[in-house]
């Protein structure tokens, strides 16, 4: 549940009664969500349960969505709207959403942000996406729509601050592609490969 009070969002969660009856003995969705009926609210400094935060974009995805809102506002002759946590959560393209969870407003309805007309790009488009991410970073105005259009669906769901996108291989498997950033002072990709190889040597 999401409630907007004076421009600020308040989140709560409630288990379905039938789900509790069938799953209560063995499945916790989140360490902060206890297995009982009724509304539950995030505690401490958390605004939303980690279960849902994992499905929301991090810095890179939020930057893409914020830039897109600026472009739409410019085209419509209005001030950019401040995006709230629910805007980021619901604005993620369903097919590439991280966090192993999907969202519907109605049990028998479609998944949210499930736009089949703009599917996940194939990995043959990696160079195009890399160039789009480079141009996006160098676009000081933040109003170059063509770069946003190429990056928003494959990249908006991904966490972290680095430019990245999700692509499909020839077998239909999803891959995360990380791109160089103008802020890099080392070859980040090469060092990630080193840590990957070390992990494999350690048996992970």
For the regions a language model picked out, list residue spans one by one.
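Phosphate/dinucleotide-binding and metal-coordinating scaffold of catalytic cores
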Residues: 1-204
């Amino acid at each position: 549940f999401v409630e907007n009070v004076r421009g600020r969002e308040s989140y709560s969660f409630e288990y379905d009664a039938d789900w509790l009856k069938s799953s209560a003995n063995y499945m916790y969705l989140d360490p902060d969500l206890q297995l009982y009926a009724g509304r539950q609210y995030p505690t401490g400094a958390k605004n939303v349960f980690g279960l849902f935060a994992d499905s929301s974009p991090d810095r890179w995805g939020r930057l893409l969505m914020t830039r897109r809102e600026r472009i739409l506002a410019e085209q419509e002759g209005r001030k950019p709207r401040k995006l709230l946590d629910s805007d980021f959560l619901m604005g993620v393209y369903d097919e590439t959403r991280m966090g192993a969870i999907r969202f519907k407003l109605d049990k028998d309805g479609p998944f949210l942000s499930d736009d089949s007309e703009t599917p996940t790009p194939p990995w043959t488009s990696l160079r195009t996406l890399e160039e789009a991410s480079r141009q996006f970073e160098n676009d000081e105005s933040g109003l170059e729509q063509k770069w946003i259009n190429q990056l928003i669906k494959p990249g908006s769901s991904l966490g972290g601050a680095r430019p990245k996108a999700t692509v499909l291989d020839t077998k239909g498997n999803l891959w995360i592609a990380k791109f160089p950033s103008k802020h890099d002072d080392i070859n980040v990709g090469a060092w990630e490969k080193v840590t990957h190889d070390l992990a494999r040597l350690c048996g992970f």
